[in-house]
């Protein structure tokens, strides 16, 4: 069985508006005539850039001797495409480009992308984009970076250096050694930064040739495949196509797939098998006027993007593995089920419910939630249903009566429930993972603050105080005295107790400078009216008194609110509970 080196699969990641799509467009739009030998060809969901085309763009760098046939770029940029494309329990992309705007530096999604790449152990190169936006930059269209750099003034060169070194510093903070590509001697120890401009083409050839060089040096063993082995791939997208019904957009990363092959694939209820009815690829650009946008092919060899038409594809989920079956039907289906079970999602007895459109996206979202210590109770692929909402609605903890939906809709029956307010479930939906998490965390923090505020309003707060000498204004009916708050927060309409725990009266009103106030904090000296006492009988001048806290409130204070109480309030609470716990150790617990 003859082996050959297949084309490495490349994914482009980065922060929104940092130039991912522009970079892909520039690479795809490189001026190579459609139809000539070594032309750039469009695949389903991907673009193949042959080595010959890269060599033409790379000038002197293009003299590199390599067995790597080119680069297969996934057309959809971003985390979503990267996480969707899973293979053998990791990312399908062999190598990635992390796009960073050289003028803006690292942003939220850049850091998120770095974490994903690190988790998946995917090698990557930094493309420092928007080189042409450096103030004073003089473009040299399609030139290598070094040639373009030499054409700049000393001031612009310095500015360029500074911006690259800001990236180097940030990467160092995150545990990566990095350097501009032309200064790197050890590519295993250093992350490569290639400054580029998608607008002018500067540095693009350098970037592509660096990718080829890294693939040649470090990835060739993993890129070995055969033209006769059974095809293995990953479903990028499930699509309805006119005249074809449900189809699968697949990235094939090993072996060969042909019309008539039996294939094993993962559906929502487990692995199933079906037969390839047709294999389709886009027509070349010169044939674009033909009404049928796809052309039928007999077979496809890895690495390639292909559209598959076959029966019974309705339940297939994006991100699932696909394998050609050759006489080992049950074994292949068992292997697919095993791969699906390898998805690493930690579930808890209580937590949020998560929905995503692909397996990889579900895994990525779950990892992000885990990193933020947000427990997950349910995690599944596909739209949110009525059944999901009913299950979530019976959860007791309000903070977990939540559905986080990444890139998935609500089914009509679920939409109707939400519209008619039949269920008390909070739904968060977004197409960007970090925004989805930010929205949930913001809501959760707001809910916690509201709950705490309500507790502070309804729970009797600890306080201790003493009657000031010379400040008895009325002895009884009610007694009116001046007091100093020694700890905690004193409020009206609370009972008061002596040092032996005996309840002796109730504070009716608190005044400061003849104005009625709602509370007095530690250190305040205020006038209070007390019902049910006579000064000199139940209580005396100079005596330390406590707010009488109901036993059930003590439990709430100690288990839910303690971290929000200041030292004086905690001291007052401990002194008051200590009175009762001398004889009843578990009082208020």
Swiss-Prot record:
Residues 197-199 are annotated as: G5. Belongs to the TRAFAC class translation factor GTPase superfamily. Classic translation factor GTPase family. IF-2 subfamily. Residues 39-43 are annotated as: G2. The keyword DNA damage does not apply. Residues 14-21 are annotated as: G1. It holds the Pfam family IF-2. Keywords: GTP-binding, Initiation factor, Nucleotide-binding, Protein biosynthesis. NCBIfam families: aIF-2, PRK04004.1, small_GTP. This is Probable translation initiation factor IF-2. The keyword Nucleotide-binding applies. One of its GO terms (molecular function) is GTP binding. PROSITE patterns: G_TR_2. Residues 75-78 are annotated as: G3. Signal peptide: none annotated. InterPro entries: EFTU-type, P-loop_NTPase, Small_GTP-bd, T_Tr_GTP-bd_dom, TF_aIF-2_arc, TIF_IF2, TIF_IF2_dom3, TIF_IF2_dom3_sf. GO terms for cellular component: cytoplasm. Function in general translation initiation by promoting the binding of the formylmethionine-tRNA to ribosomes. Seems to function along with eIF-2. Residues 129-132 are annotated as: G4. It comes from Methanocorpusculum labreanum (strain ATCC 43576 / DSM 4855 / Z). GTP binds at residues 14-21, 75-79, 129-132. CDD domains: aeIF5B_II (cd03703), IF2_aeIF5B_IV (cd16266), IF2_eIF5B (cd01887). Residues 5-219 form the tr-type G domain. The lineage of its organism: Archaea, Methanobacteriati, Methanobacteriota, Stenosarchaea group, Methanomicrobia.
